[in-house]
Amino acid sequence: MKVILDVNIILSALIRDSTTRKIILNSEFDFYFPELSLHKIRKYKDYILEKSGLSEEEYDKILAILFKYIQLVPTEEIEKNWDEAKKIMEHIDKEDVVFIATALSIEDSVIWSDDRHFEKQDKVKVLKTKEIANLS
């Protein structure tokens, strides 16, 4: 299964050695993340360090390990679906247009997110952590 990761899923995997991290590291899924959203992970680095108790070195190591299992989707691949994604999310959450555009760019993909607002759209299938865990 092709799975687009919402930024909060990656943050969760960084904060603790959780089900989320285990799924990313051990499942047979193909994981994707929009290159365009890497800044969001960097933006929360201090928060992650505080919550997790990780040193910067440990944080960098875990991030590098996670991204061995996550394929970055170049912005150019996402741009062709940006307008459609924007229409889908314009009255829901404009911050998440990038994840819808990424899913539209990767055939037969789903989004992994625990954010409820994704339920307000019906163009892209969205699975919660519990559902992903049951499939892995």
Question: Model-predicted segments: where are they?
Answer:
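PIN-domain endoribonuclease scaffold, especially VapC-family toxins
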Residues: N26-E28, E35-E84
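Alpha-helix capping/helix-boundary segments
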Residues: I10, S37, F99, H117-F118
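Short, well-structured N-terminal submotif of metal-dependent ribonuclease cores
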Residues: M1-E35
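Acidic, PIN/NYN-like endoribonuclease modules and their adjacent C-terminal/linker elements
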Residues: L38, L104-S136
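Active-site neighborhoods of divalent-metal-dependent phosphate/nucleic-acid chemistry enzymes
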Residues: Q71-V110
